[in-house]
Amino acid sequence: MGVFNYETEATSVIPAARLFKAFILDGDNLFPKVAPQAISSVENIEGNGGPGTIKKISFPEGFPFKYVKDRVDEVDHTNFKYSYSVIEGGPVGDTLEKISNEIKIVATPNGGSILKINNKYHTKGDHEVKAEQIKASKEMGETLLRAVESYLLAHSDAYN
């Protein structure tokens, strides 16, 4: 098994605490509402949202795969950090054991925030992660972030 690490950052005009509430803590409800072209539903399979919780994320028709199951690994409300692993569905299967993801939202001096994202692809055997997988993951994250950001800008009273 190999582990391939991919790190990226994304900026937002939304303050870190507000973005954490919307994007991380309420993303299950917000994503299908603001980005139905990317996520059709999120179902809580097991747990209360904290570590160990299992969620099934379903994708719209025409998407490369029907669903993924995520396991919540950490929710740090103080440091705006969230870790989860994709454990089933989507790209996980013959070549990938799991994908571990960590998102940390950091406040910026201008009142916005930076999302620091670390993805670890745990491969089976000597398989390598394809550039298309990383690109698709980054595009999905960017789509969700911009949709949530637009929603928050249009609804200034939400998630304060």
From Swiss-Prot:
An annotated GO BP: abscisic acid-activated signaling pathway
InterPro entries assigned: Bet_v_I/MLP, Bet_v_I_allergen, Plant_def-hormone_signal, START-like_dom_sf
Primary localization class, coarse: cytoplasm
Listed name of the protein: Major pollen allergen Bet v 1-J
Localization annotation: Cytoplasm
Keywords, in A-Z order: Allergen, Cytoplasm, Pathogenesis-related protein, Plant defense
Region described as Hydrophobic ligand pocket: 116-118, 133-141
GO cellular component: cytoplasm; nucleus
Domain of life per record: Eukaryota
SMART domains the record matches: Bet_v_1
Family, similarity comment: Belongs to the BetVI family.
Molecular function GO labels: abscisic acid binding; protein phosphatase inhibitor activity; signaling receptor activity
Pfam families: Bet_v_1
Residues that coordinate or bind brassinolide: 55, 82, 84, 101
Protein role: May be a general steroid carrier protein.
Tissue expression remark: Pollen.
Listed CDD domains: Bet_v1-like
